[in-house]
Amino acid sequence: MKENSEDCPLWINYDGLIILEMFRENSQQATNFLIAIAEPISRPENIHEYQITPYSLFAAASVGLTTDQITNTLQKFSKNIIPRNVKNLISDCTLSYGKLKLVRQSQKFFIEVYNDKIFNFITSDEILKSFIVNSNIDELKIEITNVEKIKKRCIEIDYPLIDEYDYTAYESVNMIKNLHIDLKPSCHIRSYQEISLNKMLGNGRARSGIIVLPCGSGKTLVGITAISTIKKSAIILCTSAVSVEQWKQSILLFTTINPYSVSRFTSDCKEWFENYNVENTSQGGILITTYSMLSFSGKRSYDVQRIINKIFAYNWGIMILDEVHVVPAQMFRKVVSSVLHQCKLGLTATLVREDDKIEDLNFLIGPKLYEANWQDLSDKGHIAKVECSEVWCEMTAEFYREYLIQDTSKKRLLSIMNPVKIQMCEYLIQKHEAQGDKIIVFSDSVFALKEYAIKMKKPFIYGPTSQTERMKILKQFQINSKINTLFLSKVGDTSIDLPEATCLIQISSHFGSRRQEAQRLGRVLRAKKRNNPNFKAYFYSLVSKDTEEMHYSAKRQQFLIDQGYSFKTIIGFNDMYYNETRLYKTKQEQKELLFNLLSKNLSSDETDK
């Protein structure tokens, strides 16, 4: 322990785990530093946990932090002497960074090598050697199709590739089409957005990497600002056609770009900006599309295939990957390596997956450049304060008796269609509609989604809902004072902007998915009313008591708890049964419902494809 240890805010464990005491005077300075060098693990109110990893140190080195700067600053804030193995890890990772650089020349790729010793080391590696086309004194030529594999191998041998794009260089100016775009004078970016962009952009160079911001905190504007700074042709990949529309609206709202320079490529809308710029072929554009449109491997129509060929032949200045956590999926990752681009920016609110592929983003996209603190943004009014509740719904005796003897799929169906859960959902909708709230009800089960919505006479959106109908329903939810509740399947988990929503009710979900829980909470974080005095949004997760739903619910909440949220448990409301017209109130209605459910040949996890 150091002599002044009681004044220092953090403790460094031998395995690189850092415990930060937020009640110390200089804790905020320490927080700002730790964000740059370590991964946030848990950030409740008083005690934060961070983990130093090779990836986090590579990211720190990528923004210019040196070995001495990291160790000296850590020692300044630490109660204890930095363990030797942690010092060695910091030294090894930061000193090896910057020795290899990925260079693009026209449509050719090279690795620039720092010195002869490293050159010999790289060329003697059997895996890397198989990817090298030919070599000169200080550079190695590689094929574009092998870039992903090479990046992965370089990380494994502790020599990560620097992947930067000098967008002011002579070759860039002449080879990549310029984009006439600026932010409008009325558009103001917030301090945390500026900090995140400074991690990516500097001295005329753009670093490929990932920015993590909560839902509703302005990820889209960060991406638009990056495009406006680089001023080169851009391709934006989204998870849905609804998201494509919202990106286009935001680009036209925040920037001075000519609307004809912004194209959409979805199943319903097939545009190519060069068709509208025939008089100025040197002018670039922005294409907004979905991962699925580019990854589809089936037969396409002539017109669609023609645009696809143009997309893959075009030299893009920047690629924006919205909801970047989906990229490690096998069908999507090939899109990243197939589209020719100079730099890429991944955006997400939840850098988590339930498989082990999230770390693949380090070589598919780049290091995490910045991650915001959810509670910080909430305290400053940038996102809404949310009251989170887990609502336990007793199962009726008849339903629970059947639940105990049925197979897994029927168990899920019975727990979702539990009459008490239906009544609780109805009660909460009526309660919050009376308070003037706009409510979203989420269900992964399409069968339950339709049953609940039709019984309660509410609109719903799920997979087969057409794009036109989706936009119409969303618009009515936003502007019509008589449409205050909307039922959504998992198609609404991401990239749907509904700032009018102030209350969320979840009746079924995808097992223990932490990411889905956070994404759904995000639907109410951007509430327009968030800066009103004493305003708070509501998030209810309805679970049938003594079923597997309770186990999965605890797993799902972990990410949000790590972000500083707390869940209170609600067992019931005293006035819930005062309404004589409550759904399934009589024993006879409940028995008929049970009979119908047991006779149906379907599973409750029937979800959108």
UniProtKB/Swiss-Prot annotation:
GO terms for biological process: nucleotide-excision repair; transcription initiation at RNA polymerase II promoter. Disulfide bonds: none annotated. Its EC number is 5.6.2.4. It is found in: Nucleus. PROSITE patterns: HELICASE_ATP_BIND_1, HELICASE_CTER. Residues 200-369 form the Helicase ATP-binding domain. ATP binds at residues 213-220. This is General transcription and DNA repair factor IIH helicase/translocase subunit XPB. The lineage of its organism: Eukaryota, Fungi, Fungi incertae sedis, Microsporidia, Enterocytozoonidae.
